[in-house]
Design a protein with these regions (language model features):
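N-terminal, positively charged/glycine-rich alpha-helical extensions of SAM-dependent methyltransferases
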Residues: 1-20
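Conserved alpha-helix/loop element of class I SAM-dependent methyltransferases that forms part
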Residues: 29-49
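Class I SAM-dependent methyltransferase SAM/SAH-binding core
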Residues: 50-107
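A short acidic, Gly/Pro-enriched loop at the edge of an enzyme's catalytic core
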Residues: 106-118
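A short SAM/SAH-binding and catalytic strip from SAM-dependent methyltransferases
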Residues: 117-129, 153
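A short glycine-rich, Lys/Arg-flanked "PGG" loop and its adjoining helix->strand segment in the class I
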Residues: 131-143
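Conserved beta-strand signature within the Rossmann-like core of class I S-adenosyl-L-methionine
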Residues: 144-151
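Core SAM-dependent methyltransferase catalytic element
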Residues: 183-199
Length: 199
């Protein structure tokens, strides 16, 4: 693939910025919407829980999490995505149910043991340092808290069972992994993982 095409794709989807980032966000809202909703369903959020959504993109899953849980935090390093989240989640932000912050998996800005659930959809392949990201997510989860992660199977940085092994090495327990086919003829197969912080 040419460097120019790679740069365009990175600006639209990998590290969204500028006009391409905003267009990429609209594409993500449509293309990832079913997976975002599925991951929120798999997490079985309760009205008393606090949720962290890593890389919420345009905010489809974050908005739903904010409607189901007590509060949902969204951390994203892209100003364009944060702007789309603020627009999509305006009512939830106004109600105090959603908060958005500049951040990443490796740098959430949250206190230790401050969330019950962490959700991540289609961004683990973009993290700068997966080991540091998993360590940070374990740190912010309360004892017994759960992680639900989903990514396009074909874009995983390593096979899903190897990703599960990385989670175990980071200190997560009760690992489960499976694949899920989102609706739609062209939707890529999603690799999904669920894990808990011990306690």
């Amino acid at each position: 693939m040419s460097t120019t095409i790679e740069q365009i794709l990175d600006r639209a989807f990998g590290h969204p910025r500028g006009l391409l980032g905003r267009v990429g966000g609209m594409v993500m809202a449509h293309g990832n919407g079913a997976t975002e909703r599925h991951v929120v369903d798999v997490a079985r959020l309760t009205p008393q829980e606090t949720v962290l959504v890593v890389g919420p993109g345009p905010g489809v899953g974050l908005r739903l999490a904010g409607q189901r849980a007590a509060i949902a935090y969204g951390v994203d390093p892209s100003p364009e995505m944060l702007g789309l989240v603020e627009a999509r989640c305006a009512a939830e932000i106004s109600a105090g149910r959603v908060r958005v912050m500049d951040g990443s998996a490796e740098r959430t800005g949250l206190e230790e043991a401050s969330v019950d659930v962490v959700l991540s959809v289609n961004n683990v392949q973009l993290w700068d340092d997966r080991a540091a990201g998993f360590a940070e997510l374990l740190r912010v989860l309360r004892p017994g808290g759960r992680l639900v992660l989903s990514a396009h199977d074909k874009w995983l940085p390593v096979p899903r069972h190897a990703l599960a092994a990385e989670l175990t090495e980071a200190g997560f327990t009760d690992l489960q992994t499976w694949v899920w086919q989102p609706p739609g003829v062209t939707a890529p197969l999603a690799a999904q993982l669920r894990a808990r912080r011990p306690g």
